[in-house]
């Protein structure tokens, strides 16, 4: 078992709240990611057979991706992916052996150059390799990727949701606080092992985000309609 974290904007979290509370995650097309070189690879046009290249491109199109991180306290990731610390970070407890058969979970490899075509690998093996390889400037993210092949749905069971961390700018009086009210309402009906709720905060000149568990006063003062 391991802990993985997913940074989300408040809107995305709210739109899929029931699924997230059930330990499900959603996939996206890798073409929608913020890296303009996502999925790129190098081949030599006059040496590498075109039909092999086309097969790899076809295999890449069969995959959708969901992105995670091993850390919840990375300041830049909160800034990039949670709308300036106004969103959330979800904490999942995950076991690879419990994933659906058409899914794979791997750490991203970071390299100085783009990956190259390799005739010793199948088209599917190369497609997966290219989708979990990024250039070194992205290494600070420490990303893990869940790849789903030929999915019939856009969400799959991933693991147990063990924590929800609300961003440092998720303050009382902010209109986003309605989501926290909804979360408290939902987890009160979950029974055993509900996720722990945390509030992220930034202290002084500390380089990392910190968090505290909501105390009894915090939880009681949230009015649930």
Residue locations for each model-derived region?
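Partner-binding and oligomerization surfaces adjacent to conserved cores of proteins
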Residues: 1-225
């Amino acid at each position: 078992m391991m802990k993985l974290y997913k940074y989300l904007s408040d809107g995305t979290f709210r739109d899929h709240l029931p699924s997230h509370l059930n330990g499900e995650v959603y996939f996206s097309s890798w073409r929608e990611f913020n890296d303009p070189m996502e999925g790129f690879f190098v081949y030599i046009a006059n040496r590498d057979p075109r039909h092999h290249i086309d097969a790899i491109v076809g295999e890449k199109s069969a995959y959708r991706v969901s992105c995670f991180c091993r850390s919840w306290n990375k300041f830049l990731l909160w800034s990039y992916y949670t709308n300036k610390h106004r969103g959330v970070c979800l904490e999942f407890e995950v076991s690879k052996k419990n994933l659906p058969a058409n899914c794979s979970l791997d750490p991203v490899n970071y390299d100085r150059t783009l990956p190259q075509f390799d005739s010793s690998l199948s088209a599917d093996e190369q497609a997966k390799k290219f989708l979990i390889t990024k250039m070194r400037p992205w290494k600070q993210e420490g990303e893990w990727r869940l790849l789903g092949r030929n999915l019939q749905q856009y969400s799959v069971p991933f693991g147990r949701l063990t924590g929800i961390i609300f961003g440092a700018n998720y303050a009382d009086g902010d209109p986003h606080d309605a989501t926290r009210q909804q979360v408290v309402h939902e987890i009160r009906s979950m029974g055993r092992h509900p996720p722990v709720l945390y509030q992220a905060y930034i202290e002084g000149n500390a380089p990392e985000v910190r968090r505290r568990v909501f105390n009894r006063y915090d939880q009681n003062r949230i009015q649930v309609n």
